[in-house]
């Protein structure tokens, strides 16, 4: 989650989290900043149709949220924010700011206090699930959209009609073992052929999104992998 960003001269790079992102292998990479980082630009193809009938939309209560654990400088700001950065914040809590994709934003608007999310490391040497966090504050206005010095400043957003929102998250725990993207992809491909909970997982079907919903079956299956040997 992003707390605040660190201004820097030029150093390692990491992540700009705009909800657009790079493809990690077959997937994605959203960036974000944590107080120091967050997500940035929106990908047109990911923008949700605002006219969709809400009544037809499925309801989710579990999530996967991506952030960059390795340093990356964007406009003089290090957008790095990994799970260790979240753990280091007061009360191990921070705001997930910088999301600049409509669909990802809309998913955050659906989040409720107490719901769980996987902290996913993206745009790094080994992307994958690092730990668990929970939502501790529901969607509210993301102040970084109005800050001209912020990497995620959006001049088209107005104070009386803000476009972007964020939630607060709190670290819960690390997974017993890091669950890499490569392993998840193997299960996804297998489940597409033979059937299984990860056959339609958004990590692969909507890879560009930095904030993704999970079904109960997907969440429980992925979490169970921490007790299994890597494949």
From Swiss-Prot:
Residues 1-54 are annotated as: Disordered. Its main location: nucleus. Keywords: Nucleus, Phosphoprotein. Residues 14-24, 45-54 have a biased composition (Basic and acidic residues). Phosphorylated. GO terms for cellular component: nucleus. It is found in: Nucleus. A motif (Nuclear localization signal) lies at residues 4-11. Gene3D superfamilies: ph1033 like domains. Specifically binds 5-hydroxymethylcytosine (5hmC), suggesting that it acts as a specific reader of 5hmC. This is Thymocyte nuclear protein 1. The gene is thyn1.
